[in-house]
């Protein structure tokens, strides 16, 4: 008998070899209808995969991220098949699923345009209706190369030749179409109910600017048209909220061709950035962290010792000083370890919490750069906690609570992923098991539901990722907690235990913002530039109706400044309606209008960005209102 243990702990028994699809049918016809793919012992699998021994099984639907990924992966093959039917001379490169859908890179002697999408989509829908079964088969290396050479697919031939000697070379067939692919896929093309092509762009083969420029067609896929409609509406809203557009309109930051991927923050942007950093420092000071600062350039040998050289060197920048090789840091952890090593530590001191707003540099290909969301230099709010093994659950639980309270201030909901050991990991099986269990215990203690993301941990340890959900439903990975047994070993760091002997501490790497620049980009889009009062670079705009009120505008502005309120004056010779509209466009939370009546009665007339005309009030009541909003960090959208 084969025992299949489901996600809820229920065990089903089968006399003979079965498949996830058969298991789904046995559970209920409704589940099978919704089923997209599966996970067998935590690894992605197809509904057609044979189960011939006891296992843990999870049936995945489109509601699961891995289910979405599988369906959209098949959608990319449907796109490729449609392209080959319509344009047989086109050459296929790669076509993966991505977060928002899928793409396929194509080499053709003509340019694809969005006007051609309707024709391609029509062929894709035809392929879906044909209900073509997806069949997997394998070939030896030489046969695989010969097979793709016969099909005149040079990019596939190159991919096969670059695979390791012992690699399994698999293909997927749907009707007349065959593609080189590792899978997994859905059972048939009919599972992909709704498709839409979104855009076309240039993409260098293998992301290398020295290679040929291909054409990348982007698309997305769903199981319901209503979900596609919601997605299109979200994209339209996202365009309005684009942080690059709003950042320029509000004079927060710019990007320049003199420094691609290196943001320039303007005065108002620095106000916002410093407000976030001040809040971060306030929270971390209360939580017992000590702030440090470490150099951005360190000797290359350090990065060999840390393991970053072997795992991260392609993303690093290098320089020479006095003929010695140095690297610009891509991460803050080695510097924090050197600070820890500067002193002998007792077990009584642990945990030691060292926090740093560190400027890091990571090389990104030019095509991947995107405003503040994908840059080449950014400030990362790292903290490193050095502790005993017995303190793991308690300390990680404390970090989870800190991150939870932090995100709530900005009005974010979030979900949590546990990422496990990757293929290029360092360390023993025992250490990885202990580290992973430490994170699981803390998540359970916090009563947090989490998704397991197999094989996506850091090279030195498993991690917990926090994915923020913004007000239009998009998710952004920001906070991370990583448990590390490897770095303490590599740097030979110790503490003196109660027995007077040296012991190895456990190290936790964690961030809350992640990249502060990226977090600002997320906030701009989350609030559509209309920051809550406590974060607004300009909190109040004071404006006159005629020149006779300029002196009173100056006096009111000074009182507000003395109260710590960020204020600007608008005494231009413009109509008051124009000034109010402009302040609204600049997303200023409050506007004060000064006319003859206000001067005569010693009051101010107040307009709120959100509530409109608030009427007249005295300056003291208005200052109290602003200070209360700032103190309470009200963040309603």
Curated annotation (Swiss-Prot):
Q: Where does Zn(2+) bind?
A: 333, 384, 509
Under Pfam families, the record lists: HGTP_anticodon (PF03129), TGS (PF02824), tRNA-synt_2b (PF00587), tRNA_SAD (PF07973)
What GO biological process, any one, is recorded here? Answer: threonyl-tRNA aminoacylation
What is this protein's function? Catalyzes the attachment of threonine to tRNA(Thr) in a two-step reaction: L-threonine is first activated by ATP to form Thr-AMP and then transferred to the acceptor end of tRNA(Thr). Also edits incorrectly charged L-seryl-tRNA(Thr).
Q: Which superkingdom does the taxonomy of this entry point to?
A: Bacteria
**SUPFAM superfamilies with a match to the protein in the record:** Class II aaRS ABD-related (SSF52954), Class II aaRS and biotin synthetases (SSF55681), TGS-like (SSF81271), ThrRS/AlaRS common domain (SSF55186)
Requisite cofactors: Zn(2+)
Q: What is its EC number?
A: 6.1.1.3
Q: Spell out the subunit comment.
A: Homodimer.
Residues annotated as domain TGS: 1-61
Q: Which NCBIfam families match?
A: thrS
Q: Where is this region: Catalytic?
A: 242-532
Task: Write down the PANTHER family for this protein, in alphabetical order.
Answer: THREONINE--TRNA LIGASE, CHLOROPLASTIC_MITOCHONDRIAL 2 (PTHR11451:SF44), THREONINE-TRNA LIGASE (PTHR11451)
This one is known as Threonine--tRNA ligase
Q: Please give the organism.
A: Clostridium acetobutylicum (strain ATCC 824 / DSM 792 / JCM 1419 / IAM 19013 / LMG 5710 / NBRC 13948 / NRRL B-527 / VKM B-1787 / 2291 / W)
| Broad class of enzyme this protein falls into | ligase
Q: Which GO terms describe its cellular component?
A: cytoplasm
Q: How is the cofactor bound?
A: Binds 1 zinc ion per subunit.
């Amino acid at each position: 008998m084969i025992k299949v243990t489901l996600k809820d702990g229920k065990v089903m028994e089968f006399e003979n070899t079965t498949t996830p699809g058969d298991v789904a049918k046995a559970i209920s016809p409704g589940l099978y209808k919704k089923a997209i793919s599966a996970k067998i012992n935590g690894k992605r699998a197809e509904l057609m995969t044979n189960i011939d021994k006891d296992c843990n099984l999870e049936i995945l639907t489109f509601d699961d991220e891995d289910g979405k990924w599988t369906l959209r992966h098949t959608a990319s093959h449907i796109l490729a098949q449609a392209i080959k039917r319509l344009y047989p001379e086109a050459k296929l490169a790669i076509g993966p699923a991505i977060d928002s859908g899928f793409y396929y890179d194509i080499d053709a002697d003509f340019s694809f345009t969005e006007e051609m999408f309707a024709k391609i989509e029509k062929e894709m829908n035809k392929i879906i209706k044909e209900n073509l079964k997806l069949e997997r088969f394998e070939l030896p290396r030489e046969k695989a190369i010969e097979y793709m050479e016969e099909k005149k697919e040079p990019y596939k031939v190159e991919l096969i030749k670059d695979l390791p000697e012992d690699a399994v070379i698999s293909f997927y067939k749907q009707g007349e179409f065959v593609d080189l692919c590792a899978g997994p896929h859905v059972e048939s093309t009919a599972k992909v109910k709704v498709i839409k092509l979104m855009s076309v762009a240039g993409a260098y083969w293998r992301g290398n600017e020295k290679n040929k420029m291909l054409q990348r067609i982007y698309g997305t896929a769903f199981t319901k048209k209503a979900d596609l409609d919601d997605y299109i509406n979200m994209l339209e809203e996202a365009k309005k909220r684009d942080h690059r557009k709003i950042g320029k309109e509000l004079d927060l930051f710019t990007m320049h061709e003199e420094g691609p991927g290196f943001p320039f923050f303007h005065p108002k942007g620095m106000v916002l950035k410093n407000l976030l950093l001040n809040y971060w420092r306030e929270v971390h000071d209360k939580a017992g962290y000590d702030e440090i600062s470490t150099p951005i350039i360190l000797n290359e040998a350090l990065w060999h010792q840390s393991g970053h050289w072997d795992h991260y060197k392609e993303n690093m920048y290098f320089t020479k000083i006095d003929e010695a090789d140095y690297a610009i840091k891509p991460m803050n952890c080695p510097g924090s370890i050197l600070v820890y090593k500067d002193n002998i530590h007792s077990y009584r001191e642990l945990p030691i919490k060292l926090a740093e707003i560190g400027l890091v540099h990571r090389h990104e290909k030019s095509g991947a750069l995107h405003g503040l969301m994908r840059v080449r230099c950014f400030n990362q709010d790292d903290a490193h906690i050095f502790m005993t093994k017995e303190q793991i659950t308690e300390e990680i639980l404390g970090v989870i609570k800190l991150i939870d309270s932090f995100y709530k201030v900005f009005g974010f909901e979030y979900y949590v992923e546990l990422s496990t050991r990757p293929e290029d990991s360092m360390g023993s099986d025992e250490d990885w098991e202990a580290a992973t269990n430490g994170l699981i215990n803390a998540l359970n203690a916090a009563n947090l539901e989490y998704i397991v993301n197999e094989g996506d941990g850091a090279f030195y340890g498993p991690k917990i990722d926090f994915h923020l959900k913004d007000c239009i439903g998009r998710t952004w990975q920001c906070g991370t907690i990583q448990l590390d047994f490897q770095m303490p070993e590599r740097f030979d760091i110790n503490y003196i235990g109660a027995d007077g002997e040296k012991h190895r501490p456990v190290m936790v790497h964690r961030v809350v913002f992640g990249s502060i620049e990226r977090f600002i980009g997320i906030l701009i889009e989350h609030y559509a530039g209309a920051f809550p009062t406590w974060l607004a670079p300009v909190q109040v705009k004071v404006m006159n109706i005629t020149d006779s009120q300029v002196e009173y505008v100056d006096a009111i502005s000074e009182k507000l400044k003395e109260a710590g309120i960020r204020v600007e004056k608008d005494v231009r010779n413009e109509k008051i309606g124009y000034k109010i509209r402009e302040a609204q466009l600049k997303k200023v939370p409050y506007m004060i209008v000064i006319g003859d009546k206000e001067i005569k009665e010693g009051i101010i007339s107040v307009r709120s960005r959100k509530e409109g005309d608030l009427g007249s009030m005295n300056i003291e009541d208005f200052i109290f209102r602003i200070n209360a909003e700032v103190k309470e960090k009200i963040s309603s959208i």
